[in-house]
């Protein structure tokens, strides 16, 4: 029989582990976390409120998550942190799609049916803020993807004609660009684990009223 207290025990244990880890990092001056896989795990737990069937994919390759009962099969997740004391748009990571020199990889980004961006404060295991793009609005990003890919391919061709290496072959999409193309009202947001009206959330971010890393 499943222990109904297990999720709370896991959260308490994880929080205590990070408290001890922070002490060790201060003592050693060494970053002791390598792959930051905890971020996708805890961000997925936040998204579960909206997507009850969501599952974190195992491994470093492939799609990050899926929620098949809600018809999400390819969810891409990005997370990041920042030293700021106030949460701003620039605190959020950019959505990055690499290997854009490969036509198959360029085509693949149009298959995603959900995107999430998560911001983590330093040595806090659960995200301070999560922004999710639901499948109903993902296609609004496609023209932006296409424009960025065309610019990148043109740069590839120019560099190759000059006998140079193609260089960094990724395209990036910022949260500001996502809002511009999707509309703040069409995104789903959480702050400190609680769902919040997306327009209210972005207004607070714009007004710099959300304190972090205190």
Where in the sequence are the language-model features?
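Nucleic-acid endonuclease domains
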Residues: 1-214
